[in-house]
């Protein structure tokens, strides 16, 4: 993509109303623009980031789940059946259609997916089942703030498991636990699973996945040993491997503030290993048994011909929230420092002297060759000053930046900058394509 053809309205100054780093940088880099309180339009750069996050999530979720797509607007009756229509409170946006039917703008999908299951699955032979979808949701936050970190409208991946008994349901929960560790690892994040409150979703087992960040609204208490753990590729059908992985990760104390047992924390975690930090929630797991299957009649016939209500779990990842969380973790004073898997473009090309014919020729050639290799490239071909172009590249966080200027070309080299480390190397013109290919993971 050439910068002259790309809609990218960057800002030089910090917006006065943006209080946290991610909100400021998402506005300045042209990722988003506010439409109303807690509601944002996503511009091309932001959409590219969302798409990259989605791609990682979908790739991993497809290993243990099946993708569906449910509507944003739901019939209020199923929420009345579950008992959550009144319990959910003012965060739920309630509306009437032209026929005076009560509808809601879905804040979550437990009721709707349970109804889909109830109407279409009859036999134990169809279990276990796991379904996920990615959809925009709405919760009428009383104080929307921090940009998309706590907005009213947000993009979310939610998955739902259906099992014949509690043992199988816990295995489904554990598979998702490991799946989430892999998802966040692929995004370059050190996620920490912590014991959590079940909130309005309900149930008796729950974990939040959080990343440590100064601006996090949650507070976690954990053993530093959890940060030393790593997750490797795993066979999701191997119960022993999956359960052992979960047992290892949960063997270290880690809790949210809501579920903290202070005495237990002090007793189990050595003083030098205690971590008490602000963190951002990026994922949440819930096991709630038959909380929804009973009122919504989600049952199957078992081997003995008896009707059994299925055991369920739900599992969420905030896609739009993740975009902000990643920025909170990966940024510096110049702008965003995207991990490669999330970056809107992997390579940026800056022509430092736009009216220099040799610079233009070399820039165009490198751009064409990188595009032919299938790499995502942003070529800043604008007739702007070099300083402005370089500042924009750092602001939007492109991982690898190729700088082409007349002085370096005289000596037959080009500068290649790695955004996260700020390291700049001089690469010969003939080797730049091969070098970029080797660098990109």
Describe each region flagged by the PLM.
Residues 1-441:
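NTP/phosphate- and nucleic-acid-binding module
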């Amino acid at each position: 993509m050439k910068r002259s053809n790309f809609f990218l309205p960057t800002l030089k100054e910090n917006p006065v109303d943006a209080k946290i780093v991610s909100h400021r940088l998402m506005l300045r880099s042209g990722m988003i623009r506010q439409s109303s309180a807690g509601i944002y339009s996503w511009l091309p750069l932001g959409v590219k980031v969302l798409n990259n996050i989605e791609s990682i999530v979908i790739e991993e979720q497809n290993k243990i789940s099946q993708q569906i797509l449910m509507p944003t607007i739901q019939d209020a009756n199923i929420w009345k059946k579950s008992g959550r229509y009144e319990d959910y409170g003012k965060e739920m946006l309630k509306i009437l259609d032209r026929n005076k039917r009560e509808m809601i703008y879905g804040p979550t999908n437990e009721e709707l997916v349970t109804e889909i299951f109830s109407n279409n699955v009859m036999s134990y032979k169809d279990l276990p089942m796991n379904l996920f979808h990615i959809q925009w949701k709405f919760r009428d936050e009383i104080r929307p703030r921090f940009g998309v970190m706590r907005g009213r409208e947000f993009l979310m991946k939610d998955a739902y498991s259906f099992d014949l008994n509690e043992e199988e349901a816990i295995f489904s929960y554990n598979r998702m636990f490991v799946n989430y560790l892999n998802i966040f690892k692929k995004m370059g994040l050190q996620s920490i699973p912590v014991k959590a409150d079940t909130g309005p979703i309900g149930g008796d087992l729950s974990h939040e996945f959080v990343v440590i960040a100064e601006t996090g609204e949650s507070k976690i208490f954990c053993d530093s040993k959890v940060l030393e753990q790593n997750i490797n590729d795993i066979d999701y059908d191997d119960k022993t491997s999956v359960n052992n992985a979960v047992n290892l990760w949960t063997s270290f104390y880690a809790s949210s503030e809501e579920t903290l047992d202070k005495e237990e924390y002090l007793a189990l975690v050595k003083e030098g290993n205690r971590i008490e930090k602000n963190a951002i929630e990026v994922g949440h797991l819930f096991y709630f048994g038959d909380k929804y299957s009973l009122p919504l009649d989600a049952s199957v016939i078992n081997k003995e011909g008896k009707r059994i209500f299925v055991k369920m779990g739900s599992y969420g990842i905030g896609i739009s929230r993740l975009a902000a969380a990643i920025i909170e973790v990966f940024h510096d004073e110049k702008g965003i420092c995207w991990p490669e898997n999330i970056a809107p473009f992997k390579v940026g090309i800056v022509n430092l002297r736009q009216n220099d014919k040799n610079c233009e020729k070399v820039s165009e050639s490198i751009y064409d060759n990188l595009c032919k290799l299938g790499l995502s490239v942003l070529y800043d071909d604008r007739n702007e000053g070099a300083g402005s172009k370089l500042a924009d590249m750092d602001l939007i966080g492109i991982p690898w930046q190729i700088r082409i200027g007349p002085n370096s070309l005289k000596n037959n080299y080009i500068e290649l900058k790695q955004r996260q480390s700020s390291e700049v190397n001089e690469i010969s013109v003939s080797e730049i394509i091969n070098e970029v290919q080797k660098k990109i993971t």
